[in-house]
């Protein structure tokens, strides 16, 4: 049962470490820096945590208002609470398992695999950079809530599918950036069919590099790498250290594609995602792109059927163009037909050899 353990503002990092170590039945899934953790634990353990010294709340439902938590992190609380909103739950229940609803997704529906970040296991640090801007690039409060909820649910898909041996835990550092008087949204060209790396970079760098500067990092991919190293070098709430790190940029600034991932970072353009596959699928988009950063391959039309990925050098056997798929393509996150990972993708991200 997923439970959010929230701590009061200003709590020492060691408080969460004590909580996580207090019972072997507690399985952390996500640690949100400065707020607390999403854990899995039996109901009696959750009840005991509510009375644990230094805990503001331990809930399996919505957090009550008025808790003494860090107000800067209220969007994470709002995101958690939105899961329990009846209208949101109805939208989730109504969405189809197949979220890429065309035979060949329009340009920008996904990205390309990155050089290996390493296997998707251990403690993964995720630096989430939301880039707000003026006019058309302005992120509304509801946008930020939806982004944060999308990240939480994306991680939920991955940790639910991961084997126990992977010991997969995500730690999140949120960097909300607002660019003022730096980048005119109208100066950045819009999406382009069949975009190249240069097309993507020429658009992205115009707002990404100022965002990197705002968080104290150099421009370009050296800045992304530097930030990833900083995520690896710090101590997180709960006393944990990350084994690997990735960065995510989410914005309304124009990009060449709606979502893509390479070189240790993923990029999501909110307006394009709203058009396809839709805001309600943002968790699937984020999870899909995260998997790309750990060598997972696309499996829909246009995929590469015989490319080998991951530590087990598994071919892309669930690619719709692979002869093996004529026997029936398995539902899979990388095919856009499921929230779950097929056995081929599990091999690509390093969880198990196929099958």
Enumerate the language-model features and the residues they cover:
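Propeptide-to-catalytic entry region of secreted or membrane-anchored zinc metalloproteases
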Residues: 111-240
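Active-site-proximal beta-strand/loop segments in catalytic clefts of secreted hydrolases
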Residues: 129-134, 249-255, 272-273, 296, ...
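Autoinhibitory N-terminal propeptides
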Residues: 1-37, 43-113
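Active-site recognition of the HExxH zinc-binding catalytic motif
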Residues: 284-299
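Short pre-active-site segment immediately N-terminal to the catalytic Zn-binding motif
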Residues: 266-287
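Loop/turn elements at helix/coil->beta-strand transitions in domains of secreted/extracellular proteins
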Residues: 122-127, 242-247, 264-267, 297, ...
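Catalytic zinc-binding patch centered on the HExxH motif and its immediate surroundings
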Residues: 252-267, 319-320
């Amino acid at each position: 049962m997923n439970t959010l353990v929230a701590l009061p503002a200003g709590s020492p990092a060691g408080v969460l470490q004590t909580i996580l170590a207090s019972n072997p039945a507690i399985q952390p899934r996500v640690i949100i820096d400065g707020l607390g953790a999403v854990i899995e634990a039996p109901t009696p353990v959750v009840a005991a945590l509510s009375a644990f010294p230094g805990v503001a709340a331990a809930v399996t439902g919505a957090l009550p208002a008025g808790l003494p938590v860090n107000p800067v992190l209220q969007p994470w609380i709002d995101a958690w609470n939105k899961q329990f909103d009846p209208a949101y739950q109805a939208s989730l229940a109504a969405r189809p398992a197949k979220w890429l609803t065309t035979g060949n997704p329009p340009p920008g529906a996904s990205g390309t695999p990155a050089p290996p970040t390493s296997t998707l296991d251990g403690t993964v640090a995720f630096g989430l950079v939301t880039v707000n801007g003026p006019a058309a690039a302005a992120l509304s409060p509801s946008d930020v809530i939806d982004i944060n909820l999308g990240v939480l649910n994306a991680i939920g898909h991955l940790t639910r599918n991961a084997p126990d041996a992977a010991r997969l835990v995500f730690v999140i550092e949120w960097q909300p950036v607002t660019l003022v008087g730096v980048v005119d949204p109208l100066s950045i060209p819009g999406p382009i069919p069949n975009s190249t790396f240069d097309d993507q970079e020429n658009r992205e760098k115009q707002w990404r590099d100022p965002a990197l500067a705002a968080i104290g990092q150099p421009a370009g991919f050296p800045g992304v790498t530097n930030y990833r190293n900083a995520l690896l070098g710090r101590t997180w709430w709960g006393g944990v250290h990350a084994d690997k790190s990735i960065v995510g940029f989410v914005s309304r600034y124009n990009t060449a594609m709606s979502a893509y991932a390479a070189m240790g970072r993923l990029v999501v353009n909110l307006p394009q995602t709203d058009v396809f596959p839709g805001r309600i699928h943002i968790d699937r988009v984020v999870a899909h792109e995260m998997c790309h950063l750990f060598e997972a391959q696309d499996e829909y039309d246009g995929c590469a059927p015989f490319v080998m990925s991951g530590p087990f050098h598994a071919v892309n056997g669930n690619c719709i163009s692979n002869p093996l798929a004529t026997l029936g393509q398995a539902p899979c996150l990388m095919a856009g037909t499921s929230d779950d990972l097929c056995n081929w993708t599990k091999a690509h991200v390093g969880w198990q050899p196929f099958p």
